[in-house]
Protein backbone atom coordinates (compact mmCIF):
# COMPACT_ATOMS: atom_id res chain seq x y z
CA UNK A 1 0.00 0.00 0.00
CA UNK A 2 2.81 2.42 0.85
CA UNK A 3 5.65 3.34 -1.47
CA UNK A 4 8.38 5.96 -1.12
CA UNK A 5 9.85 8.34 -3.67
CA UNK A 6 13.56 9.00 -4.14
CA UNK A 7 13.60 11.47 -1.26
CA UNK A 8 12.03 9.00 1.15
CA UNK A 9 8.64 10.73 1.22
CA UNK A 10 5.62 8.42 1.46
CA UNK A 11 3.71 7.92 -1.77
CA UNK A 12 0.42 6.13 -1.27
CA UNK A 13 -1.84 4.86 -3.99
CA UNK A 14 -5.15 3.28 -3.10
CA UNK A 15 -6.63 1.23 -5.90
CA UNK A 16 -10.34 2.03 -6.41
CA UNK A 17 -12.69 -0.94 -6.15
CA UNK A 18 -14.27 -2.39 -9.23
CA UNK A 19 -17.32 -0.57 -10.55
CA UNK A 20 -19.57 -3.47 -9.65
CA UNK A 21 -18.50 -3.06 -6.02
CA UNK A 22 -18.78 0.72 -6.01
CA UNK A 23 -21.29 1.95 -8.61
CA UNK A 24 -20.64 5.61 -7.74
CA UNK A 25 -17.25 5.35 -9.43
CA UNK A 26 -19.04 4.94 -12.79
CA UNK A 27 -21.18 8.05 -12.40
CA UNK A 28 -19.21 10.62 -14.34
CA UNK A 29 -16.94 13.11 -12.56
CA UNK A 30 -17.35 11.86 -9.00
CA UNK A 31 -14.01 12.21 -7.15
CA UNK A 32 -12.16 9.02 -6.41
CA UNK A 33 -10.58 8.16 -3.08
CA UNK A 34 -6.78 8.29 -3.46
CA UNK A 35 -3.74 8.04 -1.26
CA UNK A 36 -3.53 11.82 -1.15
CA UNK A 37 -6.78 11.82 0.81
CA UNK A 38 -4.99 9.89 3.55
CA UNK A 39 -2.05 12.26 3.72
CA UNK A 40 -3.79 15.63 3.87
CA UNK A 41 -7.16 17.07 4.78
CA UNK A 42 -8.95 20.20 5.87
CA UNK A 43 -11.66 21.05 8.37
CA UNK A 44 -13.39 23.88 10.20
CA UNK A 45 -10.89 25.38 12.63
CA UNK A 46 -13.33 27.85 14.18
CA UNK A 47 -15.39 25.21 15.99
CA UNK A 48 -12.48 24.02 18.12
CA UNK A 49 -11.13 25.96 21.11
CA UNK A 50 -8.70 28.32 19.37
CA UNK A 51 -8.30 31.46 21.48
CA UNK A 52 -9.23 33.74 18.60
CA UNK A 53 -6.87 32.20 16.04
CA UNK A 54 -9.87 31.24 13.88
CA UNK A 55 -13.35 32.70 13.32
CA UNK A 56 -16.43 31.74 11.33
CA UNK A 57 -15.45 33.99 8.42
CA UNK A 58 -11.85 32.71 8.38
CA UNK A 59 -12.13 29.13 9.55
CA UNK A 60 -9.72 27.14 7.39
CA UNK A 61 -7.70 24.45 9.17
CA UNK A 62 -5.43 21.99 7.43
CA UNK A 63 -4.22 18.57 8.52
CA UNK A 64 -1.39 16.34 7.46
CA UNK A 65 -0.39 12.94 8.72
CA UNK A 66 2.22 12.67 11.48
CA UNK A 67 4.75 10.00 10.46
CA UNK A 68 6.08 9.70 14.03
CA UNK A 69 2.80 8.36 15.42
CA UNK A 70 1.58 5.09 13.86
CA UNK A 71 -1.90 4.80 12.33
CA UNK A 72 -4.22 2.23 13.83
CA UNK A 73 -7.65 0.69 13.30
CA UNK A 74 -10.20 0.81 16.10
CA UNK A 75 -13.52 -0.83 15.31
CA UNK A 76 -14.44 0.07 11.74
CA UNK A 77 -12.38 3.27 11.71
CA UNK A 78 -8.82 3.92 10.60
CA UNK A 79 -7.17 6.61 12.70
CA UNK A 80 -4.35 8.69 11.21
CA UNK A 81 -2.57 10.78 13.87
CA UNK A 82 -2.12 14.22 12.35
CA UNK A 83 -1.05 17.79 12.98
CA UNK A 84 -3.37 20.77 12.43
CA UNK A 85 -2.59 24.34 11.42
CA UNK A 86 -4.66 27.34 10.42
CA UNK A 87 -4.70 28.87 6.96
CA UNK A 88 -2.26 31.45 8.39
CA UNK A 89 0.20 28.78 9.54
CA UNK A 90 -0.39 29.04 13.30
CA UNK A 91 -0.71 25.74 15.16
CA UNK A 92 -4.26 24.84 16.19
CA UNK A 93 -3.36 21.58 17.90
CA UNK A 94 -1.26 20.53 20.88
CA UNK A 95 0.96 18.18 18.89
CA UNK A 96 2.63 20.63 16.49
CA UNK A 97 4.24 22.64 19.34
CA UNK A 98 5.34 19.36 20.92
CA UNK A 99 7.11 18.40 17.70
CA UNK A 100 8.72 21.86 17.58
CA UNK A 101 9.94 21.58 21.17
CA UNK A 102 11.36 18.08 20.70
CA UNK A 103 13.09 19.31 17.55
CA UNK A 104 14.64 22.20 19.51
CA UNK A 105 15.71 19.82 22.28
CA UNK A 106 17.43 17.57 19.76
CA UNK A 107 19.15 20.44 17.97
CA UNK A 108 20.52 22.02 21.14
CA UNK A 109 21.45 18.65 22.64
CA UNK A 110 23.40 17.61 19.55
CA UNK A 111 25.32 20.87 19.69
CA UNK A 112 26.20 20.59 23.38
CA UNK A 113 27.12 16.91 23.22
CA UNK A 114 29.31 17.62 20.20
CA UNK A 115 31.20 20.17 22.26
CA UNK A 116 31.75 17.41 24.83
CA UNK A 117 33.15 15.10 22.17
CA UNK A 118 30.02 12.98 21.73
CA UNK A 119 28.77 12.90 18.15
CA UNK A 120 25.14 11.93 17.69
CA UNK A 121 22.52 12.09 14.95
CA UNK A 122 19.94 13.47 17.37
CA UNK A 123 18.22 13.14 20.71
CA UNK A 124 15.21 10.98 21.51
CA UNK A 125 12.68 12.10 24.12
CA UNK A 126 10.85 9.17 25.75
CA UNK A 127 8.04 9.10 28.28
CA UNK A 128 5.94 6.55 30.15
CA UNK A 129 2.53 7.61 31.45
CA UNK A 130 0.84 6.10 34.51
CA UNK A 131 -2.90 6.60 34.01
CA UNK A 132 -5.06 6.62 37.14
CA UNK A 133 -8.85 6.30 36.97
CA UNK A 134 -11.92 5.51 39.04
CA UNK A 135 -14.44 2.83 38.04
CA UNK A 136 -17.90 3.22 39.58
CA UNK A 137 -21.18 1.33 39.11
CA UNK A 138 -22.95 2.81 36.11
CA UNK A 139 -26.41 2.63 37.68
CA UNK A 140 -25.19 4.80 40.56
CA UNK A 141 -23.36 7.08 38.11
CA UNK A 142 -26.65 7.83 36.34
CA UNK A 143 -28.08 8.94 39.67
CA UNK A 144 -25.35 11.59 39.99
CA UNK A 145 -25.84 14.55 37.60
CA UNK A 146 -22.56 16.03 38.82
CA UNK A 147 -20.54 12.99 37.75
CA UNK A 148 -22.30 12.96 34.38
CA UNK A 149 -21.86 16.66 33.62
CA UNK A 150 -18.77 17.68 35.60
CA UNK A 151 -16.84 14.46 36.19
CA UNK A 152 -16.70 15.04 39.95
CA UNK A 153 -19.06 15.13 42.90
CA UNK A 154 -19.96 18.66 43.99
CA UNK A 155 -21.71 17.29 47.08
CA UNK A 156 -21.70 14.04 48.96
CA UNK A 157 -21.25 12.95 52.55
CA UNK A 158 -18.30 10.71 53.35
CA UNK A 159 -19.29 7.18 54.40
CA UNK A 160 -18.09 5.58 57.60
CA UNK A 161 -15.17 4.06 55.74
CA UNK A 162 -12.89 5.56 53.12
CA UNK A 163 -9.25 4.60 52.57
CA UNK A 164 -8.32 4.50 56.26
CA UNK A 165 -7.59 0.77 56.23
CA UNK A 166 -5.05 1.11 53.39
CA UNK A 167 -6.40 -2.13 51.98
CA UNK A 168 -7.10 -1.19 48.38
CA UNK A 169 -3.63 -0.40 47.02
CA UNK A 170 -2.22 -3.40 45.12
CA UNK A 171 -4.92 -5.71 46.51
CA UNK A 172 -6.00 -8.53 44.17
CA UNK A 173 -8.56 -7.69 41.51
CA UNK A 174 -11.41 -10.01 42.44
CA UNK A 175 -13.44 -11.93 39.88
CA UNK A 176 -16.83 -11.39 41.52
CA UNK A 177 -17.01 -7.79 40.25
CA UNK A 178 -16.68 -6.55 36.67
CA UNK A 179 -13.56 -4.47 37.40
CA UNK A 180 -11.17 -7.32 36.63
CA UNK A 181 -12.87 -8.35 33.38
CA UNK A 182 -13.14 -4.72 32.36
CA UNK A 183 -9.44 -4.04 32.93
CA UNK A 184 -8.46 -7.24 31.13
CA UNK A 185 -10.44 -6.19 28.06
CA UNK A 186 -9.01 -2.68 28.20
CA UNK A 187 -5.53 -4.14 28.15
CA UNK A 188 -6.37 -6.54 25.31
CA UNK A 189 -7.96 -3.80 23.19
CA UNK A 190 -4.90 -1.63 23.71
CA UNK A 191 -2.60 -4.47 22.63
CA UNK A 192 -4.62 -4.82 19.42
CA UNK A 193 -3.91 -1.21 18.42
CA UNK A 194 -0.23 -1.41 19.33
CA UNK A 195 -0.35 0.13 22.80
CA UNK A 196 1.78 -1.96 25.20
CA UNK A 197 0.02 -1.55 28.55
CA UNK A 198 2.46 -3.27 30.88
CA UNK A 199 0.68 -3.23 34.22
CA UNK A 200 -2.78 -2.89 35.75
CA UNK A 201 -3.49 -2.65 39.47
CA UNK A 202 -5.57 -1.12 42.21
CA UNK A 203 -4.63 2.31 43.51
CA UNK A 204 -4.97 3.83 46.98
CA UNK A 205 -8.58 5.05 46.98
CA UNK A 206 -11.58 2.72 46.83
CA UNK A 207 -12.53 1.97 43.20
CA UNK A 208 -9.32 3.62 41.96
CA UNK A 209 -7.13 1.80 39.43
CA UNK A 210 -4.07 2.38 37.28
CA UNK A 211 -2.62 1.33 33.93
CA UNK A 212 0.98 1.90 32.87
CA UNK A 213 2.64 1.24 29.48
CA UNK A 214 6.16 0.56 28.35
CA UNK A 215 8.19 3.71 27.64
CA UNK A 216 8.06 5.11 24.12
CA UNK A 217 8.51 8.21 21.97
CA UNK A 218 6.99 11.29 23.57
CA UNK A 219 4.87 12.00 20.48
CA UNK A 220 3.43 8.52 20.00
CA UNK A 221 3.01 7.95 23.75
CA UNK A 222 1.01 11.16 24.05
CA UNK A 223 -1.28 10.08 21.22
CA UNK A 224 -1.60 6.59 22.61
CA UNK A 225 -2.52 7.82 26.07
CA UNK A 226 -5.50 9.66 24.59
CA UNK A 227 -6.55 6.43 22.88
CA UNK A 228 -6.14 4.54 26.17
CA UNK A 229 -8.49 7.02 27.86
CA UNK A 230 -11.06 6.54 25.08
CA UNK A 231 -10.82 2.75 25.29
CA UNK A 232 -11.18 2.86 29.09
CA UNK A 233 -14.41 4.86 28.87
CA UNK A 234 -15.90 2.68 26.12
CA UNK A 235 -15.01 -0.60 27.77
CA UNK A 236 -16.22 0.48 31.21
CA UNK A 237 -19.69 1.14 29.79
CA UNK A 238 -19.76 -2.37 28.34
CA UNK A 239 -19.29 -3.82 31.85
CA UNK A 240 -21.87 -1.66 33.58
CA UNK A 241 -19.25 0.74 34.91
CA UNK A 242 -18.43 4.40 34.42
CA UNK A 243 -14.81 5.53 34.17
CA UNK A 244 -13.92 8.83 35.86
CA UNK A 245 -10.82 10.62 34.56
CA UNK A 246 -11.21 13.81 36.59
CA UNK A 247 -8.44 14.61 39.07
CA UNK A 248 -10.66 14.78 42.17
CA UNK A 249 -14.02 13.08 41.63
CA UNK A 250 -14.56 12.39 45.35
CA UNK A 251 -13.89 14.49 48.42
CA UNK A 252 -12.03 12.84 51.27
CA UNK A 253 -10.18 10.15 49.30
CA UNK A 254 -7.21 10.40 46.97
CA UNK A 255 -7.61 11.89 43.54
CA UNK A 256 -6.01 10.73 40.30
CA UNK A 257 -2.84 11.77 38.53
CA UNK A 258 -0.91 10.85 35.43
CA UNK A 259 2.77 10.47 36.30
CA UNK A 260 4.89 11.59 33.36
CA UNK A 261 8.12 9.54 33.48
CA UNK A 262 10.55 11.49 31.31
CA UNK A 263 13.94 10.61 29.82
CA UNK A 264 16.25 11.61 26.97
CA UNK A 265 18.81 9.61 25.05
CA UNK A 266 20.89 9.87 21.90
CA UNK A 267 19.72 8.28 18.67
CA UNK A 268 22.49 5.72 19.20
CA UNK A 269 21.13 4.66 22.60
CA UNK A 270 23.18 6.58 25.17
CA UNK A 271 20.76 7.43 27.99
CA UNK A 272 21.62 10.91 29.19
CA UNK A 273 19.97 10.43 32.59
CA UNK A 274 21.51 7.01 33.30
CA UNK A 275 25.03 7.82 34.56
CA UNK A 276 26.47 4.30 34.52
CA UNK A 277 25.19 3.47 31.04
CA UNK A 278 26.13 6.93 29.75
CA UNK A 279 29.73 6.60 30.92
CA UNK A 280 29.95 3.09 29.45
CA UNK A 281 28.83 4.51 26.10
CA UNK A 282 30.93 7.70 26.12
CA UNK A 283 33.86 7.07 28.48
CA UNK A 284 33.46 10.74 29.39
CA UNK A 285 32.69 11.56 33.06
CA UNK A 286 31.76 15.16 32.21
CA UNK A 287 28.64 14.49 30.14
CA UNK A 288 26.31 13.50 32.97
CA UNK A 289 26.98 16.42 35.36
CA UNK A 290 26.75 18.89 32.46
CA UNK A 291 23.35 17.47 31.47
CA UNK A 292 22.19 17.60 35.09
CA UNK A 293 23.35 21.21 35.38
CA UNK A 294 21.28 22.10 32.32
CA UNK A 295 18.20 20.43 33.80
CA UNK A 296 18.56 21.85 37.31
CA UNK A 297 19.04 25.37 35.98
CA UNK A 298 16.09 25.00 33.59
CA UNK A 299 13.81 23.83 36.40
CA UNK A 300 14.81 26.74 38.63
CA UNK A 301 14.44 29.36 35.89
CA UNK A 302 11.22 28.05 34.39
CA UNK A 303 9.34 26.42 37.26
CA UNK A 304 6.47 28.80 36.55
CA UNK A 305 5.99 27.20 33.14
CA UNK A 306 5.91 23.70 34.61
CA UNK A 307 3.29 24.90 37.10
CA UNK A 308 1.33 26.44 34.23
CA UNK A 309 1.42 23.19 32.28
CA UNK A 310 -0.31 21.25 35.09
CA UNK A 311 -3.02 23.83 35.79
CA UNK A 312 -5.97 21.63 34.91
CA UNK A 313 -9.11 22.60 36.86
CA UNK A 314 -9.09 19.35 38.84
CA UNK A 315 -5.52 19.88 40.03
CA UNK A 316 -6.72 22.77 42.21
CA UNK A 317 -7.96 20.11 44.62
CA UNK A 318 -4.85 17.88 44.50
CA UNK A 319 -1.66 19.92 44.56
CA UNK A 320 -0.46 20.33 48.10
CA UNK A 321 -3.30 18.24 49.55
CA UNK A 322 -1.11 15.51 51.05
CA UNK A 323 -1.89 13.18 48.16
CA UNK A 324 -0.02 14.85 45.30
CA UNK A 325 3.13 16.96 45.20
CA UNK A 326 2.81 20.53 46.48
CA UNK A 327 2.47 23.53 44.19
CA UNK A 328 6.15 24.30 44.83
CA UNK A 329 8.24 23.32 41.80
CA UNK A 330 11.38 21.57 43.07
CA UNK A 331 13.33 18.41 42.34
CA UNK A 332 14.45 15.51 44.51
CA UNK A 333 17.87 14.09 43.61
CA UNK A 334 18.56 11.99 46.69
CA UNK A 335 21.46 12.28 49.10
CA UNK A 336 23.89 10.27 46.95
CA UNK A 337 23.34 12.26 43.75
CA UNK A 338 23.26 15.53 45.67
CA UNK A 339 26.58 14.73 47.31
CA UNK A 340 28.11 13.83 43.94
CA UNK A 341 27.00 17.10 42.33
CA UNK A 342 28.25 19.08 45.32
CA UNK A 343 31.66 17.44 44.90
CA UNK A 344 31.50 18.23 41.17
CA UNK A 345 30.81 21.90 41.94
CA UNK A 346 33.81 21.87 44.28
CA UNK A 347 36.04 20.70 41.43
CA UNK A 348 35.95 16.90 41.52
CA UNK A 349 36.09 15.06 38.19
CA UNK A 350 35.00 11.61 39.32
CA UNK A 351 32.56 9.38 37.48
CA UNK A 352 29.20 9.06 39.18
CA UNK A 353 28.17 5.48 39.78
CA UNK A 354 24.88 5.09 41.64
CA UNK A 355 25.47 3.09 44.80
CA UNK A 356 23.53 0.05 45.82
CA UNK A 357 23.20 -1.35 49.30
CA UNK A 358 22.32 -4.86 50.50
CA UNK A 359 18.89 -5.45 51.97
CA UNK A 360 18.51 -8.39 54.31
CA UNK A 361 15.08 -9.76 55.23
CA UNK A 362 16.45 -11.48 58.31
CA UNK A 363 15.30 -14.86 57.05
CA UNK A 364 17.82 -17.59 56.25
CA UNK A 365 15.71 -19.00 53.42
CA UNK A 366 15.48 -15.64 51.64
CA UNK A 367 18.64 -14.28 50.14
CA UNK A 368 19.61 -10.62 50.60
CA UNK A 369 19.14 -8.39 47.56
CA UNK A 370 20.87 -5.28 46.23
CA UNK A 371 18.72 -2.15 46.18
CA UNK A 372 19.36 1.48 45.16
CA UNK A 373 21.01 3.57 47.82
CA UNK A 374 18.31 6.22 47.35
CA UNK A 375 14.81 6.05 48.77
CA UNK A 376 11.71 7.24 46.87
CA UNK A 377 10.29 10.70 47.56
CA UNK A 378 6.63 10.81 46.52
CA UNK A 379 6.22 14.38 47.79
CA UNK A 380 8.47 15.88 45.12
CA UNK A 381 6.86 17.07 41.88
CA UNK A 382 9.94 16.18 39.81
CA UNK A 383 12.06 13.49 41.49
CA UNK A 384 15.03 11.77 39.86
CA UNK A 385 14.55 8.02 39.59
CA UNK A 386 17.85 6.50 38.48
CA UNK A 387 17.47 6.88 34.71
CA UNK A 388 14.56 9.29 34.41
CA UNK A 389 12.70 12.13 36.06
CA UNK A 390 9.11 11.58 37.11
CA UNK A 391 6.81 14.59 36.78
CA UNK A 392 4.29 13.52 39.41
CA UNK A 393 2.03 16.57 39.39
CA UNK A 394 0.30 16.03 36.04
CA UNK A 395 -3.49 15.70 36.23
CA UNK A 396 -5.20 12.45 35.23
CA UNK A 397 -7.51 14.11 32.70
CA UNK A 398 -4.78 16.03 30.91
CA UNK A 399 -3.46 15.72 27.40
CA UNK A 400 0.25 15.70 28.25
CA UNK A 401 1.34 17.51 25.08
CA UNK A 402 1.74 20.86 26.82
CA UNK A 403 3.56 19.31 29.79
CA UNK A 404 6.13 17.70 27.52
CA UNK A 405 6.34 20.73 25.24
CA UNK A 406 7.41 22.75 28.28
CA UNK A 407 9.86 20.09 29.50
CA UNK A 408 11.52 19.83 26.09
CA UNK A 409 11.68 23.61 25.62
CA UNK A 410 13.20 24.44 28.99
CA UNK A 411 15.72 21.60 28.60
CA UNK A 412 16.69 22.96 25.19
CA UNK A 413 17.20 26.32 26.88
CA UNK A 414 19.41 24.71 29.53
CA UNK A 415 21.52 23.04 26.85
CA UNK A 416 21.79 26.26 24.84
CA UNK A 417 22.80 28.30 27.88
CA UNK A 418 25.86 26.08 28.30
CA UNK A 419 26.74 25.59 24.62
CA UNK A 420 26.58 29.33 23.86
CA UNK A 421 29.16 30.01 26.54
CA UNK A 422 31.33 27.14 25.34
CA UNK A 423 31.31 28.72 21.88
CA UNK A 424 32.71 31.87 23.47
CA UNK A 425 35.65 29.95 24.92
CA UNK A 426 34.47 28.73 28.32
CA UNK A 427 34.69 25.09 29.38
CA UNK A 428 31.41 23.20 29.63
CA UNK A 429 32.28 21.84 33.07
CA UNK A 430 33.09 25.31 34.38
CA UNK A 431 29.75 26.65 33.14
CA UNK A 432 27.96 23.62 34.60
CA UNK A 433 29.58 24.19 38.00
CA UNK A 434 28.51 27.82 37.98
CA UNK A 435 24.92 26.95 37.01
CA UNK A 436 24.63 24.27 39.67
CA UNK A 437 25.95 26.61 42.33
CA UNK A 438 23.44 29.29 41.30
CA UNK A 439 20.37 27.07 40.85
CA UNK A 440 20.90 24.30 43.42
CA UNK A 441 18.26 25.97 45.59
CA UNK A 442 15.62 24.13 43.52
CA UNK A 443 16.89 20.78 44.87
CA UNK A 444 14.89 19.69 47.91
CA UNK A 445 15.31 16.19 49.32
CA UNK A 446 13.01 16.65 52.30
CA UNK A 447 9.31 16.14 52.95
CA UNK A 448 7.26 18.24 50.54
CA UNK A 449 4.21 17.80 52.80
CA UNK A 450 5.96 19.46 55.73
CA UNK A 451 4.06 22.62 56.68
CA UNK A 452 7.31 24.58 56.84
CA UNK A 453 8.29 23.79 53.24
CA UNK A 454 6.23 26.49 51.43
CA UNK A 455 7.78 29.21 53.58
CA UNK A 456 11.24 27.74 53.05
CA UNK A 457 10.61 27.60 49.31
CA UNK A 458 9.66 31.27 49.35
CA UNK A 459 12.84 32.07 51.27
CA UNK A 460 14.88 30.16 48.68
CA UNK A 461 13.19 32.11 45.90
CA UNK A 462 11.88 29.12 43.95
CA UNK A 463 8.55 28.99 42.16
CA UNK A 464 5.41 28.50 44.27
CA UNK A 465 2.10 29.37 42.60
CA UNK A 466 -0.87 28.03 44.55
CA UNK A 467 -3.54 29.26 42.16
CA UNK A 468 -3.93 27.44 38.86
CA UNK A 469 -5.52 30.56 37.39
CA UNK A 470 -2.45 32.63 38.26
CA UNK A 471 -0.19 29.90 36.90
CA UNK A 472 -2.00 29.88 33.54
CA UNK A 473 -1.28 33.59 33.18
CA UNK A 474 2.46 32.89 33.28
CA UNK A 475 2.07 31.68 29.68
CA UNK A 476 2.23 35.22 28.33
CA UNK A 477 4.74 36.98 30.56
CA UNK A 478 7.59 38.47 28.55
CA UNK A 479 10.27 35.98 29.60
CA UNK A 480 8.15 33.01 28.60
CA UNK A 481 6.99 34.40 25.28
CA UNK A 482 10.64 35.15 24.53
CA UNK A 483 11.65 31.60 25.48
CA UNK A 484 9.05 29.95 23.27
CA UNK A 485 9.80 32.37 20.46
CA UNK A 486 13.55 31.76 20.61
CA UNK A 487 13.04 28.04 20.01
CA UNK A 488 10.17 28.56 17.53
CA UNK A 489 7.79 26.53 19.68
CA UNK A 490 5.04 29.16 20.04
CA UNK A 491 4.66 32.59 18.49
CA UNK A 492 3.36 35.38 20.72
CA UNK A 493 -0.03 34.96 19.07
CA UNK A 494 -0.02 31.23 19.81
CA UNK A 495 0.94 31.85 23.47
CA UNK A 496 -1.88 34.35 23.94
CA UNK A 497 -4.40 32.08 22.24
CA UNK A 498 -3.49 29.11 24.40
CA UNK A 499 -3.69 31.14 27.57
CA UNK A 500 -7.18 32.26 26.52
CA UNK A 501 -8.20 28.65 25.84
CA UNK A 502 -6.89 27.45 29.22
CA UNK A 503 -8.63 30.23 31.14
CA UNK A 504 -11.91 29.72 29.30
CA UNK A 505 -11.68 25.99 29.98
CA UNK A 506 -11.28 26.73 33.68
CA UNK A 507 -14.22 29.15 33.67
CA UNK A 508 -16.42 26.76 31.70
CA UNK A 509 -15.58 23.87 34.00
CA UNK A 510 -16.49 25.84 37.11
CA UNK A 511 -19.67 27.22 35.57
CA UNK A 512 -20.78 23.71 34.63
CA UNK A 513 -20.06 22.43 38.15
CA UNK A 514 -21.86 25.32 39.83
CA UNK A 515 -24.98 25.16 37.66
CA UNK A 516 -25.13 21.42 38.19
CA UNK A 517 -24.90 21.98 41.94
CA UNK A 518 -27.80 24.46 41.78
CA UNK A 519 -29.91 21.98 39.81
CA UNK A 520 -29.11 19.12 42.20
CA UNK A 521 -30.10 21.20 45.20
CA UNK A 522 -33.37 22.32 43.61
CA UNK A 523 -34.31 19.00 42.02
CA UNK A 524 -33.01 16.51 44.58
CA UNK A 525 -31.89 17.96 47.91
CA UNK A 526 -34.84 20.26 48.62
CA UNK A 527 -37.47 17.66 47.58
CA UNK A 528 -35.70 15.09 49.78
CA UNK A 529 -35.80 17.48 52.75
CA UNK A 530 -39.52 18.06 52.23
CA UNK A 531 -40.22 14.35 51.80
CA UNK A 532 -38.37 13.64 55.06
CA UNK A 533 -40.29 16.42 56.83
CA UNK A 534 -37.07 18.20 57.83
CA UNK A 535 -38.19 21.64 56.73
CA UNK A 536 -36.07 23.41 59.36
CA UNK A 537 -33.08 22.81 57.05
CA UNK A 538 -34.67 24.49 54.03
CA UNK A 539 -33.63 28.12 54.75
CA UNK A 540 -29.92 27.28 55.03
CA UNK A 541 -29.97 25.10 51.92
CA UNK A 542 -31.91 27.67 49.89
CA UNK A 543 -29.54 30.45 50.97
CA UNK A 544 -26.47 28.39 50.01
CA UNK A 545 -28.02 27.60 46.64
CA UNK A 546 -28.75 31.28 45.99
CA UNK A 547 -25.14 32.25 46.74
CA UNK A 548 -23.85 29.77 44.18
CA UNK A 549 -26.45 30.86 41.62
CA UNK A 550 -25.63 34.55 42.08
CA UNK A 551 -21.90 33.87 41.85
CA UNK A 552 -22.38 32.13 38.50
CA UNK A 553 -24.20 35.14 37.11
CA UNK A 554 -21.45 37.41 38.46
CA UNK A 555 -18.93 35.56 36.27
CA UNK A 556 -20.55 37.00 33.17
CA UNK A 557 -20.02 40.56 34.36
CA UNK A 558 -16.47 40.04 35.61
CA UNK A 559 -14.92 41.92 32.70
CA UNK A 560 -11.98 40.30 30.94
CA UNK A 561 -11.14 36.61 30.89
CA UNK A 562 -8.47 36.65 33.66
CA UNK A 563 -10.86 38.44 36.03
CA UNK A 564 -13.62 35.96 35.23
CA UNK A 565 -11.23 33.06 35.84
CA UNK A 566 -10.18 34.52 39.20
CA UNK A 567 -13.85 34.90 40.17
CA UNK A 568 -14.50 31.31 39.05
CA UNK A 569 -11.74 30.08 41.34
CA UNK A 570 -13.31 31.87 44.32
CA UNK A 571 -16.70 30.42 43.38
CA UNK A 572 -15.29 26.92 43.23
CA UNK A 573 -12.95 26.90 46.23
CA UNK A 574 -15.00 29.07 48.58
CA UNK A 575 -18.67 29.57 47.68
CA UNK A 576 -19.31 26.02 46.43
CA UNK A 577 -17.39 24.44 49.30
CA UNK A 578 -19.49 26.37 51.83
CA UNK A 579 -22.66 25.27 50.05
CA UNK A 580 -21.43 21.70 50.06
CA UNK A 581 -20.97 21.73 53.82
CA UNK A 582 -24.62 22.71 54.24
CA UNK A 583 -25.88 20.04 51.84
CA UNK A 584 -23.66 17.28 53.24
CA UNK A 585 -24.91 18.03 56.75
CA UNK A 586 -28.47 17.59 55.50
CA UNK A 587 -27.62 14.28 53.80
CA UNK A 588 -26.48 13.00 57.20
CA UNK A 589 -29.99 13.33 58.66
CA UNK A 590 -32.25 12.52 55.70
CA UNK A 591 -33.33 8.84 55.74
CA UNK A 592 -31.67 6.77 53.02
CA UNK A 593 -34.99 5.90 51.39
CA UNK A 594 -35.79 9.61 51.00
CA UNK A 595 -32.40 10.60 49.49
CA UNK A 596 -32.60 10.37 45.70
CA UNK A 597 -28.93 10.89 44.83
CA UNK A 598 -26.46 8.00 44.76
CA UNK A 599 -24.33 8.16 47.90
CA UNK A 600 -20.58 7.73 48.28
CA UNK A 601 -21.30 4.32 49.79
CA UNK A 602 -22.99 3.23 46.55
CA UNK A 603 -20.32 4.78 44.33
CA UNK A 604 -17.07 3.89 46.06
CA UNK A 605 -17.24 0.30 47.20
CA UNK A 606 -17.53 -1.77 44.06
CA UNK A 607 -15.83 -4.75 45.69
CA UNK A 608 -17.40 -4.65 49.13
CA UNK A 609 -21.05 -3.54 48.94
CA UNK A 610 -24.27 -5.14 47.80
CA UNK A 611 -24.91 -4.40 44.15
CA UNK A 612 -26.27 -5.81 40.95
CA UNK A 613 -23.39 -8.33 40.91
CA UNK A 614 -24.82 -10.29 43.83
CA UNK A 615 -22.43 -9.44 46.66
Protein language model regions, located:
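Glycine-rich, acidic/polar active-site loops that bind/position phosphate-bearing ligands
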Residues: 1-245, 250, 254-258, 263-502
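C-terminal amphipathic alpha-helical interaction region
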Residues: 438-615
